[in-house]
Amino acid sequence: MKLVFLGPPGAGKGTQAAGVSAHLRVPHISTGDMFRSAIKNETPTGLEAKRYIDAGQLVPDSVVIAMVQERLAMDDCANGYLLDGFPRTVEQAIALESFSSLDAVVDIAVPDERLMDRLTGRRVCGKCQGTFHISKLADENTCPVCGGSTYQRDDDKPETITARLKAYHEQTEPLIGYYSGLGKVHHEGNCKLITIDGDQKPEDVFKSILTSLE
C-alpha cells in the first residue's frame, strides 16, 4: 500500500505513521530522515541538497522531488511505502503522481486550539531529555522522572506555534482540495482522501486509521 500522511504540528502524525508502517510492513519515509540519509550516504541528490543547506538556502522543489523519487525506487518500497512530510504543496503532489500512484492520503485533523494546548503545554527535562505535558506534572518546572529542571522549547512557544499552524494551513488546504477532487487543481487518480479525527487517544486514532484503510 502506498500512503501519504498529512497533519499539522502536534497532531501526532509521526507517531501514527510509524505505527501504521510497522503494521503494514512498509517503510516509513519522513522527509527529514530521507534528507539526513541521502546527505550521509553522499547520493547525488544528497550532495546537491547539502550545497543549498550549507549556503543557508531552501532546498528547491526539483531537488526534493528527485530525492523522493530516488528513495521510492529502492527495493524496500516495492510493496508500498508511507510518506510523511511530502508532498507539502500541490506542485509536489503533481510531481509525485508522475512517478508513483498513491492508494490513499490520510489527513489527521485536530482543531487549532487543541494543538495550541498540546504544544504550548509541552516541557522538556534538561537532564534526562524526557518530554512531558504540564497537565501531567505536579510541578511544571520539575521532571517527575529524574528531578531535573524542565523548560519550554522555543518551538513550543505560542507565537511560534501560531506561525507554524498558519504556514501549515496555507500549504495544506490546497493540497487537501487537490486530493479530495474539490480544489482548483485536482487529482484524477484512484487515490482516496481519508480524514481522521486526531483529537482522540493515540490508540483510538491508530484504530480509526487501520479501519479506514481496510
PLM-predicted stretches and their roles:
Residues 1-214:
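Glycine-rich phosphate-binding loop of ATP-dependent small-molecule kinases
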